[in-house]
């Protein structure tokens, strides 16, 4: 791997993938949207190309001359005034990238999907790459578009394009400028505005391990295969307490909110967003329905086939807390 294109390069995971590639001496071309915030790329010796994955011509120019493409560009949203954009970017945009890679003779594509595109085991069961997708009726446009785009990638893999798929879990770590949903949980705890929890669990993973997983997938992944990039399965209660302990603050959970009550409250917020504010609500009933499941995943395949190892979660949380505090988030 000598030259690589990274779509979504200015994003949380994407910028860490860029850094991993640079550390290995790879020439990196970054595709960023016109006017997009690029703080995470400041100071890096990279080639910047402006373009939108919805524009086939721009994508075709971007892939020209690279041997590897890392496709991370995607829209993540719990609410939008017009949901068409999430399909245009996540599904059609992915199709544009895959077609450009096939036509341009790109040697390998690492396609960033999500655990959202994998099925959820019942109860507190642990899912793997083989768990059939079972979230069709959830009603989440994000979840559905991630699954549909993953199917596009697998279809191209079956028709001659060397594509390997990675499925990150819930990443956290430094440079989470947005912040991401996992990072926002940490920020809210540090600010003292979140001392409640709800049923469910997640798989947390250091974003730098996720980035490393992309490189390992490019080098060792099998065409047409999925690889879960996750580390530790943890109940939401325990995650809140762990962040509090690492941060040195009171870890008592004041209130555990029943899921039905959360759905009622978020339904009201969603109605206000739809009809009054036209701004994203704090949460939605669909997001609660998804997040209140136990989103537990097995990383065995990434460990055995990609050679992955993972950082200590507590040490990673400590670094994340320090980063947020040093930049005034809390």
Where do the PLM segments sit?
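N-terminal Rossmann NAD(P)H-binding glycine-rich loop of SDR-like oxidoreductase domains
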Residues: 4-24
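NAD(P)H-binding glycine-rich loop region in Rossmannoid oxidoreductase-like domains
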Residues: 35-42, 46-92, 100
């Amino acid at each position: 791997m000598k030259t690589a294109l990274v779509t979504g390069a200015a994003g949380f995971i994407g910028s860490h993938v860029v850094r991993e590639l640079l550390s290995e001496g790879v020439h990196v071309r970054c595709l960023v949207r016109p006017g997009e915030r690029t703080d995470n790329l400041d100071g890096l010796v990279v080639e910047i190309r402006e373009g939108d994955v919805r524009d086939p011509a721009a994508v075709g120019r971007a892939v020209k001359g690279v041997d590897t493409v890392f496709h991370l560009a995607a829209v993540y949203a719990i609410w939008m005034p017009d949901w068409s954009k999430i399909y245009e970017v996540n599904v059609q945009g992915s199709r544009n990238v895959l077609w450009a890679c096939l036509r341009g003779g790109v040697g390998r594509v690492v396609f960033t999907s999500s655990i959202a595109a994998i099925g959820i085991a019942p109860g507190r069961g642990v899912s793997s790459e083989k768990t059939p997708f079972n979230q069709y009726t959830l009603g989440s446009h994000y979840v559905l578009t991630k699954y549909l785009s993953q199917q596009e990638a697998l279809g191209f893999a079956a028709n001659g394009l060397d594509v390997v798929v990675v499925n990150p879990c819930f990443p956290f770590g430094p440079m989470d400028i947005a912040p991401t949903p996992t990072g926002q949980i940490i920020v809210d705890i540090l600010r003292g505005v979140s001392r409640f929890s709800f049923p469910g669990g997640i798989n947390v993973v250091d974003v730098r391990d996720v980035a490393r997983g992309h490189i390992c997938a490019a080098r060792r992944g099998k065409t047409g295969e999925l690889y879960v990039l996750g580390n530790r399965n943890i109940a939401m209660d325990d995650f809140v307490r762990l962040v509090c302990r690492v941060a040195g603050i009171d870890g008592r959970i004041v209130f555990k909110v029943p899921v039905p009550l959360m759905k009622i409250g978020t339904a009201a917020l969603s109605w206000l967003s739809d009809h009054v504010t036209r701004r994203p609500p704090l949460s939605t009933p669909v997001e609660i329905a998804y997040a209140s499941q136990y989103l537990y995943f097995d990383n065995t395949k990434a460990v055995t086939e990609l050679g992955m190892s993972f950082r200590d979660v507590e040490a990673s949380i400590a670094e994340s807390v320090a980063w947020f505090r040093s930049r005034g988030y809390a």
